[in-house]
């Protein structure tokens, strides 16, 4: 018998192997009335691309837009890294920003653990996003900058961190979700997303998606 996919987890875009005792989030967060500040181990999946409709399409093994996930070996599932994160909200607006070590890790060895900070070798990675919620809709615009370039081979595989070069690049994105129908506990929402990376030699430099959920 032929099957569509080898593993049930594949239907949820979960393709990574099991990792024992890997740290996803570990740190200290201080909370004010309209703001949060966090320092410690964290990954991008905690704070970005987690809105209601988008989370149905992402947050598995890809986790975030491919213009970022396929371009940099960052703290994206199943990897994490040392992070300084904050967000501020007022009215329907929220601004959030995260500063990470340029490479994510999930091991427990001396040279592979999420507590490493090596800006000269791994680079620095920063993500910023502005969000607006109004009348059943959520709208987002953001940008990410990495201080090192990770090329790809002819097979599309990303180079190792030791082979990266000192060349900054950025990715930007806009996306929105809007409820178009609601009755009792059921609703339908439409989604549109677009993103580009400034370096066309990265794993993915342009991405777009339309969806209904």
Regions inferred by a protein language model and the residue ranges of each:
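Outer-membrane beta-barrel pore domains and translocons
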Residues: 1, 42-44, 100-102, 144-148, ...
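Outer membrane beta-barrel
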Residues: 1-102, 132, 202-209
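Flexible, solvent-exposed coil segments and beta strand-coil junctions
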Residues: 2-11, 60-68, 103-112, 151-158, ...
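Short loop/turn motifs that connect adjacent beta-strands in outer-membrane beta-barrel proteins
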Residues: 33-34, 89-92, 133-139, 181-188
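Membrane-embedded beta-strand positions of outer-membrane beta-barrel proteins
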Residues: 37-39, 86, 95-97, 139-143, ...
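Surface-exposed beta-loop-beta
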Residues: 103-175
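Solvent-exposed loop/turn segments connecting transmembrane beta-strands
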Residues: 166-167, 196-207
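Surface-exposed extracellular loop regions of Gram-negative outer-membrane beta-barrel proteins
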Residues: 171, 175-195
């Amino acid at each position: 018998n032929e099957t569509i996919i080898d593993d049930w987890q594949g239907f949820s875009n979960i393709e990574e192997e099991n990792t024992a005792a890997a740290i996803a989030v570990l740190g200290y967060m201080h909370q004010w009335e309209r703001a949060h500040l966090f320092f410690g181990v964290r990954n991008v999946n905690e704070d970005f691309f987690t809105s209601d409709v988008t989370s149905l399409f992402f947050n598995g093994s890809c986790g975030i837009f491919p213009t970022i996930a396929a371009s940099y070996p960052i703290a994206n599932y199943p990897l994490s890294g040392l992070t300084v994160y904050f967000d501020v909200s007022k009215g329907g607006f929220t601004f959030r920003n995260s500063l990470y070590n340029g490479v994510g890790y999930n091991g427990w060895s001396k040279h592979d653990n999420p507590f490493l900070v090596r800006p000269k070798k791994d680079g620095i990675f920063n993500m910023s996003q502005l969000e607006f919620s109004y009348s059943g809709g959520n709208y987002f615009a953001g940008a990410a900058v990495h201080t090192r370039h990770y090329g790809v081979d002819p097979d599309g595989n990303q180079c190792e961190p030791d082979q990266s070069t000192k060349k900054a690049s950025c990715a930007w994105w806009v996306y929105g979700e809007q409820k178009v129908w609601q009755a009792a506990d059921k609703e339908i929402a439409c989604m549109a997303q677009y993103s580009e990376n400034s370096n066309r030699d990265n794993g993915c430099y342009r991405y777009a998606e339309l969806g209904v959920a």
